[in-house]
Amino acid sequence: MKHYSIQPANLEFNAEGTPVSRDFDDVYFSNDNGLEETRYVFLGGNQLEARFPEYPHPLFVVAESGFGTGLNFLTLWQAFDQFREAHPQAQLQRLHFISFEKFPLTRSDLVLAHQHWPELAPWAEQLQAQWPMPLPGCHRLLLDEGRVTLDLWFGDINELTSQLDDSLNQKVDAWFLDGFAPAKNPDMWTQNLFNAMARLARPSGTLATFTSAGFVRRGLQDAGFTMQKRKGFGRKREMLCGVMEQTLPLPCSTPWFNRTGSSKREVAIIGGGIASALLSLALLRRSWQVTLYCADEAPALGASGNRQGALYPLLSKHDEALNRFFSNAFTFARRFYDQLPVKFDHDWCGVTQLGWDEKSQHKIAQMLSMDLPEELAVAVEANAVEQITGVATNCSGITYPQGGWLCPAELTRNVLELAQQQGLQIYYQYQLQDLSRKDDCWLLNFAEDQQATHSVVVLANGHQISRFSQTSSLPVYSVAGQVSHIPTTPELAKLKQVLCYDGYLTPQNPANQHHCIGASYHRGSEDTAYSDEDQQQNRQRLIDCFPQAQWAKEVDISEKEARCGVRCATRDHLPMVGNVPDYEATLVEYASLAEQKDKAVSAPVYDDLFMLDALGSRGLCSAPLCAEILAAQMSEEPIPMDASTLAALNPNRLWVRKLLKGKAVKAG
């Protein structure tokens, strides 16, 4: 069975207050002066102080083999801040740090370890505040308003490097080869790791390590680095430095899921909901020139316009990609929303998913068997549900303590307002009719004879995405739904958490003293007219799931208050994020893919045309990470997702899976 919780570091603090690993019998940093050793070995060994002012790109990427207490990262971050203060006009503006850790520290141990270096406190406190829960995979932390990005990969580095997407190849400017000493932790110091370091290193990229072990030097040379010895720090006689002086050939392991970015930095986004709003922010942070075209007269009039939406992950014991994506998307979303410098109605009150019948009880039992971290999800017995939710249901379930609700409409509006302050241009009542290539750009034809030309285009317009010739064959479908707005009552007012059953019920929003009950589900429909039948069904589903609950019968729908919207969904419940695939070319190029995988060309896509769509009913959870993934891909930066999960988000995935099995593909 797949486990979704990572084992934390097993450590103790010695007489000097230095953390020591019980498993590896080694210190996390020098008892003498760990901070100075980091500056000498890793910053000095990679010549970063001299390289930063002369670096010709806006982003510098550092990768590290063992995060530990984060000393190397914090020291580098401090040095990077000092560089930016001294050279405000330098080309280099942002720092990206990628680190791998098999046994992450608990937050409490991290805080204790950081007390060693009071001079690093301003940076350490920011790291502590965002320290992720022990889930496998990549945790992206956006620090210093996005000027510093930390990708923490939890798991075995030798396993993780083989799971990295090809888009990370030749992206790393400097390697910090750190970790417990080779004699203490031989499983990490392998030729497999050295080869991965070479694959990820940019031509002329560097590396530094505290060890001078001969097998390490020879292994790195065999991988492609030019190595040399340097005087070690303090009492250590020698250390190693290296340079990638060659350009290694890089075969693409899965060309049918290959992702391409763009060298251009000017984009039009078609949308107006949460996906386009968050993508605008992510691209502006990367210095893109962004224009948004919205078909409506105001933002968030589509699927993002609800008063309250629940935030919690979608989990399934039988779907590895779904679990990996949504668990990491959920934790990223919470960190992201907590940092946003905009106001929006929300309450991280928790979400409880209830087993209201035999099928839902079985599903929850399977989820609980996945060894999830307690910070993510915990079992709750029927007699405890009333205590944590405030209402009696006679059902057991699963609770997401960090979940809750937020107002999507307010979030979307205020994020777009923030983006406008950062340079976003918005045009309302621009209904895109079609788009076509013209002189290496995209010509956009809008209703009422309006036209515009842009270098890059992103389609983030929900269920309307399939209205264009380039996207008409995508396997997505519309789902119309009605959310009921009901006034609170003395009993309903006791509800403290979001309840999920065969529907959902939110606690009252203090801003309007109403609850939301959702939502009806009409697959294939785009009808947004109010429905008395849907209103009644929303109420009845609540009563049917909790027949003994008097509070459920108090739900009053007589005001006929509701909101109808249309979602865009996929069969596998995952979003579509990436290049817009060329359907006809895919069928031609991959006609014999099942028999000729070794001859496969890169996935046929439309140049400089991307999509962020099909968020279904979990857009509040998935949109922040999807926006970050797409912005990173478009900007040719490291993507915070492993290759197999990233493939499960690829817009061509449903076609390619069939073609890999030699099956016929139908449009839509």
UniProtKB/Swiss-Prot annotation:
Its EC number is 2.1.1.61, 1.5.-.-. It catalyses: 5-aminomethyl-2-thiouridine(34) in tRNA + S-adenosyl-L-methionine = 5-methylaminomethyl-2-thiouridine(34) in tRNA + S-adenosyl-L-homocysteine + H(+). GO terms for molecular function: flavin adenine dinucleotide binding; oxidoreductase activity, acting on the CH-NH group of donors; tRNA (5-methylaminomethyl-2-thiouridylate)(34)-methyltransferase activity. Signal peptide: none annotated. Residues 1-245 are annotated as: tRNA (mnm(5)s(2)U34)-methyltransferase. PANTHER family: SARCOSINE DEHYDROGENASE-RELATED, TRNA 5-METHYLAMINOMETHYL-2-THIOURIDINE BIOSYNTHESIS BIFUNCTIONAL PROTEIN MNMC. This is tRNA 5-methylaminomethyl-2-thiouridine biosynthesis bifunctional protein MnmC. It comes from the Bacteria. In the N-terminal section; belongs to the methyltransferase superfamily. tRNA (mnm(5)s(2)U34)-methyltransferase family. InterPro entries: FAD-dep_OxRdtase, FAD/NAD-bd_sf, MnmC-like_methylTransf, SAM-dependent_MTases_sf, tRNA_MAMT_biosynth_bifunc_MnmC, tRNA_MNMC2, tRNA_S-uridine_synth_MnmC_C. GO terms for biological process: methylation; tRNA wobble uridine modification. The keyword S-adenosyl-L-methionine applies. Coiled coil: none annotated.
